[in-house]
Amino acid sequence: MSVTGLPFDDFRVLLRDLPGPDSQALVAARDRDRQLTKPPGSLGRLEEIAMWLAAWSGRAPAVNRPLVAIFAGNHGVARHGITPFPSSVTQQMVENFAAGGAAINQICVAHDLGLKIFDLALDYPTGDITVEPALSERDCAATMAFGMEAIAGGTDLLCLGEMGIGNTTIAAAINLALYGGSAEDWVGPGTGSQGEMLERKIAVVKQAVEFHRDHLSDPLEVMRRLGGREIAAMAGAILAARMERIPVLIDGYVATAAAALLKAANPSALDHCLIGHVSAEPGHLKAIDKLGKTPLLALGMRLGEGTGAALAAGIVKAAAASHTGMATFEQAGVTNAGTH
């Protein structure tokens, strides 16, 4: 326990001492990969993914209990008319998820993925970030802790997504605070903002970052001031997964912004994470580049709700299955290039 006892203190301690990869599991996976019936490197990124799974799960690559976790939150900044949809759509989409009617439901069925939906005080939008912090430190820390519970039921691959009207505005503000540049660099159409609405969105992001500019050197302060409940919850889930050695797939622009806050706090904080896809939101590729990551997919999607991460989970499952299920040269009676 720290001397101050402030709500963020426990998270600061966790972020300072993150567990690393399992070197023995990685060595074992590399040894097996060299024996499989294929030329070295011929499966490309599938081989890299298998090694990543081994290193961060501490065992032979396997995906037996994949889970998509979607966090939903509402934002006070939406009152500025920055999106074509009202905030009530967040609750309506949560109900659609529960009824099995959304795109993510179909992708989860297709790839045999579990799905959990977490609605985060939807009747109580966060503060309007142009004039006040989104959350108090206590509320932000509590929401991070709630997000950590995403893994409570057990999973060996966590896919993170979100739902929240106005949250691409939030993501743009976070990226501007972390990386600089102009608001125009980070603001895109989101759910369809165009023309004057897009100009309002840009102005709101500028105003928010300017209002909080004296408090943006600390990533956790950026989170509570410019973020939202789904941002805090996803950050908590990523952190919990790291502590429990669970590999993570991050979805789109908003989920990437949540992840970026952790990397800003500790450069190694996302080593157990891959980016599922690059979305069509203009700032997403720039944000991914800032993290030093390469997305698994580029399908022109910009839906959110974990869809890109869920699709990428199919690739990760295939990587694990290839590594564990393929025969070795000896088992198959196939001559290895290095043995004749």
Swiss-Prot record:
Pathway where this protein functions: Nucleoside biosynthesis; alpha-ribazole biosynthesis; alpha-ribazole from 5,6-dimethylbenzimidazole: step 1/2
TM stretches of this protein: none
Record-annotated active site: 305 (proton acceptor)
Bridged cysteine pairs (disulfide): none
Catalytic activity field: 5,6-dimethylbenzimidazole + nicotinate beta-D-ribonucleotide = alpha-ribazole 5'-phosphate + nicotinate + H(+)
InterPro entries named among the record's database cross-references: Nict_dMeBzImd_PRibTrfase, Nict_dMeBzImd_PRibTrfase_bact, Nict_dMeBzImd_PRibTrfase_N, Nict_dMeBzImd_PRibTrfase_sf
Keyword check for Methyltransferase: no
EC id: 2.4.2.21
Region forming the signal peptide: none
Molecular function via GO: nicotinate-nucleotide-dimethylbenzimidazole phosphoribosyltransferase activity
Annotated function: Catalyzes the synthesis of alpha-ribazole-5'-phosphate from nicotinate mononucleotide (NAMN) and 5,6-dimethylbenzimidazole (DMB).
Similarity section: Belongs to the CobT family.
HAMAP family: CobT
Protein name per Swiss-Prot or TrEMBL: Nicotinate-nucleotide--dimethylbenzimidazole phosphoribosyltransferase
Source species: Allorhizobium ampelinum (strain ATCC BAA-846 / DSM 112012 / S4)
